Design a protein with these regions (language model features):
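Short, surface-exposed basic-aromatic patches at helix termini and helix-loop junctions that form
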Residues: 88-97
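Gly-rich Lys/Arg/Thr-decorated short loops/hinges at beta-loop-alpha junctions or inter-strand turns
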Residues: 34-46
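Short amphipathic alpha-helical "interface-anchor" segments enriched in bulky aromatics
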Residues: 176-215, 219, 223-228
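An anionic, glycine-rich sequence signature occurring as long contiguous blocks
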Residues: 97-198
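Active-site beta-loop-alpha junctions enriched in small/polar residues
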Residues: 2-5, 44-46, 81-83, 103-105
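Active-site beta-loop-alpha junctions of metal-dependent nucleic acid enzymes
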Residues: 43-67
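Active-site-proximal, Lys/Arg-enriched surface segment
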Residues: 2-29
Length: 228
């Protein structure tokens, strides 16, 4: 997960980010869900795509983990910012399980319209919030082959909602809802980033030089890893 790090001076490689609407750096961390440790950290320039170089970071982390524990099972989770071909490709090359968010497009909406209508009708008829799932093989134009997509359709008092993930988890073919829930648990990683940024003040990157700020970020992260 990345997190925004607003800047207020003339730090090197800070740029305006359209989504966050501020000048910033964009740190990105790979966090282990088993122990909350930060395994890999980088400091992206302010307007970078969050997935920039993430495939290389992932390859390095997986290689180091397998050097220590050859039989370790690795499952990658990331939001739709990391749902890009490079991340699918490297995960499949490394033979690890992955579940990555995917932005809804016209085709996915078409495939899930009837399920969303069913969820809405059930909610309106019972007053009970509805949460339904569908899954199917899907191939985007930029993909070399089909991949398994799970779509969640919700209807409740707040309205309707659709979310999609791409996954190669074996259980997703039988229990797509469980696969989606395992993905949704990645929200805890966002909490770890909040602790790193707020509690450990990892956003204190006020030096003019990029590499000095990168070193500061490493120190903040080392302190965080000592505490978890």
């Amino acid at each position: 997960d990345p997190f925004d790090d607003p800047t207020h001076g003339q730090q090197q490689l800070t740029f305006f980010h359209g989504y966050y609407r501020q000048y910033q750096y964009l740190p990105r961390a790979i966090t282990c869900a088993e122990n909350d440790l930060v395994l890999s950290l980088c400091l992206l320039y302010g307007s970078a795509h969050p997935a920039l170089g993430a495939d290389e970071d992932l390859e390095y982390v997986v290689r180091r983990l397998r050097e220590a524990w050859p039989e370790v099972e690795i499952h990658l989770r990331g939001d739709s910012g990391f749902g890009v071909p490079a991340m699918y490709d490297i995960s499949e090359q490394l033979e690890i399980d992955y579940t990555l968010g995917m932005g809804m497009n016209a085709r996915l909406k078409k495939y899930s319209d009837s399920l969303l209508e069913t969820a809405l009708a059930r909610f309106e008829g019972t007053g009970v919030p509805q949460r339904l799932f569908t899954a199917f093989w899907y191939r985007a134009e930029s993909w070399p082959a089909q991949r398994w997509v799970v779509i969640k359709c919700e209807a409740n008092a707040q309205g309707t909602n659709r979310r999609a993930v791409v996954t190669n988890r074996p259980g997703a073919f039988v229990l797509p809802g469980a696969a989606y829930d395992a993905y949704a648990d990645r929200g805890e990683s966002e909490n770890r980033n909040k602790e790193l940024k707020g509690g450990l003040q990892a956003d204190r990157l006020s030096d003019h030089r990029y590499f000095a700020n990168l070193f500061r970020l490493y120190l903040h992260t080392a302190g965080y890893n000592l505490l978890v």
